[in-house]
């Protein structure tokens, strides 16, 4: 984790396993205040050495009274710092100070109406009623001594509490999730109103610190960069190239799972445009042989991740002195793969598929950033908009957009349909409004009629979502006439397709990718 210069105010977030914990840090950074996520096992002395302005306890999937419950160093409460407990964090604080936590009659998940009963600093200038996002199975049923009820909801009589004399605050809901309509304001009240932070964190600070960190880590050694042409790997390549110049060699692996025209575009942009040393490896046959007959999505991801590293290993053996491998791993990649405390949603290609005998040391300069921060970073580095605003594309590529076994025919269907979708979205001027859009092949066939003949062909799914950081997302309301054009074109122009469906599921409960 990057430690910035002492003049920057910092809020520490302790990780108790919530899938939303990175969002807390993200929200705080949006306010211009630096925030770091640390494991709940961090000691009070370690926190004191960081000189933070305040601490936030994240939520988590455990019960504070259950076996294996996660706790923190009790001396943290003696530091005299403001503490804000969210969900599990509030329950932990309650238990620590002698209150009561019990299992709820039923798990509460979704939107709820919060009623503010006591206007503590946390609720300053906020409406008395507001919609919040609940996700919990336990409740605080008895307040600790010195605490008062700040807020209630229909199913949660103690939805918020505080002990303002000690600057201790807790909420049962998740203000960091955008479904909580005044969540940002509530966190802002803690950061500025309670902790007294000042703005000072920005991407220029990040670049300054990260360049220094890369140079210090690499020294006179050489780095291989896994270049795909997507936003993340492009920013990594340019950032590292800025730090160490020709000590960087980019390897572009064409695994046969790329979008239409992608391979040619990558070579033109980085080899010719940025004057980087880019080695292209044609590994289509190698990947397809490994993936033959494989249907399980987790197995596919790990095979693709392993093969990537082995390809790099093979290429590195042909080069001299390659010690480091650079990857575009983001905060969101890590949280979706599960931390020591978070439950795994799915293994990520940058963090879940690495072989144990890997010969490289990893450099992941973006692993403290969210996608929108990466785009800002890319712009600061002078990367053209067409790359900075390129569609997010997973490392396994079309391999996880073909559900089940991958074949050349299925890949071609996804590749061509995706190209049509992207073309029409850009034509409609929606490419900056929609966070991510792509087609997927669920593998099911259905009956249709084309040219007075019966067909039995594939269904193509369209996925398009709006989001800020990829941690939560809503399905995009694409105009019907645009959807109609996309549907007509795909059915008419892509062989073996006779039906189009549109995914209208948000995240959560679904993830953005289908596998």
Curated annotation (Swiss-Prot):
GO terms for molecular function: ATP binding; GMP synthase activity. Residues 10-200 form the Glutamine amidotransferase type-1 domain. Keywords: ATP-binding, Glutamine amidotransferase, GMP biosynthesis, Ligase, Nucleotide-binding, Purine biosynthesis. Its EC number is 6.3.5.2. GO terms for cellular component: cytosol. Coiled coil: none annotated. Pathway: Purine metabolism; GMP biosynthesis; GMP from XMP (L-Gln route): step 1/1. It catalyses: XMP + L-glutamine + ATP + H2O = GMP + L-glutamate + AMP + diphosphate + 2 H(+). Residues 201-390 form the GMPS ATP-PPase domain. InterPro entries: Class_I_gatase-like (IPR029062), GATASE (IPR017926), GMP_synth_C (IPR001674), GMP_synth_GATase (IPR004739), GMP_synthase (IPR022955), GMPS_ATP_PPase_dom (IPR025777), NAD/GMP_synthase (IPR022310), Rossmann-like_a/b/a_fold (IPR014729). It is an enzyme of class 6 (ligase). The active site is at residues 87, 174, 176. ATP binds at residues 228-234. NCBIfam families: guaA_Cterm, guaA_Nterm, PRK00074.1. PANTHER family: GMP SYNTHASE [GLUTAMINE-HYDROLYZING] (PTHR11922:SF2), GMP SYNTHASE-RELATED (PTHR11922). Homodimer. Catalyzes the synthesis of GMP from XMP. This is GMP synthase [glutamine-hydrolyzing].
């Amino acid at each position: 984790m990057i430690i910035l210069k002492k003049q920057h105010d910092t809020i520490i977030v302790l990780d108790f396993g919530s899938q939303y914990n990175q969002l807390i840090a993200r929200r705080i950074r949006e306010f211009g205040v630096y925030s770091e996520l640390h494991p709940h096992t961090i000691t009070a002395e370690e926190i004191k050495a960081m000189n933070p302005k305040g601490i936030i306890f994240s939520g988590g999937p455990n019960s504070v009274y259950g076996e294996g419950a996660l706790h923190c160093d009790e001396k943290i409460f003696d530091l005299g710092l403001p503490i804000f407990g969210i969900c599990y964090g509030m329950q932990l604080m309650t238990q620590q100070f002698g209150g009561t936590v019990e299992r709820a009659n039923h798990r509460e998940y979704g939107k709820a109406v919060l009623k503010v009963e006591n206007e503590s600093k946390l609720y300053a200038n906020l409406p008395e009623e507001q919609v919040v996002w609940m996700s919990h199975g336990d409740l605080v049923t008895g307040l600790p001594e010195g605490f008062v009820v700040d807020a209630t909801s229909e199913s949660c009589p103690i939805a918020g509490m505080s002990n303002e004399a000690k600057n201790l605050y807790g909420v049962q809901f998740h203000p960091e999730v955008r479904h909580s309509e005044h969540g940002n304001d509530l966190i802002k009240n803690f950061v500025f109103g309670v902790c007294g932070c000042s703005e000072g964190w920005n991407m220029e600070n990040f670049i300054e610190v990260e360049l220094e960190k890369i140079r210090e880590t690499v020294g006179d050694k050489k780095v291989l960069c896994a270049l795909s042409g997507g936003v993340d790997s492009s920013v990594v390549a340019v950032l590292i190239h800025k730090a160490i110049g020709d000590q960087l060699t980019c390897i572009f692996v064409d695994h046969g799972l790329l979008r239409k025209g992608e391979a040619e575009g990558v070579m033109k942009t980085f080899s010719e445009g940025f004057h980087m040393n880019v080695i292209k490896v044609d590994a289509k046959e190698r990947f397809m042989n490994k993936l033959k007959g494989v249907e399980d999505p987790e197995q596919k991801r790990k095979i693709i991740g392993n093969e990537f590293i082995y390809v790099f290993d093979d290429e590195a053996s042909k080069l001299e002195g390659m010690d480091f491998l650079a990857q575009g791993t983001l905060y969101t990649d890590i949280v979706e793969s599960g931390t020591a405390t978070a439950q795994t949603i799915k293994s990520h290609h940058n963090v879940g598929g690495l072989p144990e005998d890997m010969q490289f040391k990893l450099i992941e300069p973006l692993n403290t950033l969210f996608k929108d921060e990466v785009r800002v970073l890319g712009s600061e580095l002078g990367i053209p908009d067409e790359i900075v605003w390129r569609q997010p594309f997973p490392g396994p590529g079309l391999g996880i957009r073909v559900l089940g076994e991958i074949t050349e025919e299925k890949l071609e269907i996804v590749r061509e349909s995706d190209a049509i979708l992207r073309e029409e979205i850009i034509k409609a001027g929606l490419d900056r409004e929609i966070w991510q859009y792509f087609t997927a092949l669920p593998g099911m066939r259905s009956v249709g009629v084309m040219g007075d003949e019966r067909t039995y062909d594939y269904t193509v799914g369209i996925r398009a979502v709006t989001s800020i950081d990829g941690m939560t997302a809503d399905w995009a309301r694409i105009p019907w006439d645009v959807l109609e054009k996309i549907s007509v074109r795909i059915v008419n122009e892509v062989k073996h397709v006779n039906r189009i469906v549109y995914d209208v599921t948000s995240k959560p409960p679904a993830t953005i990718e289908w596998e």
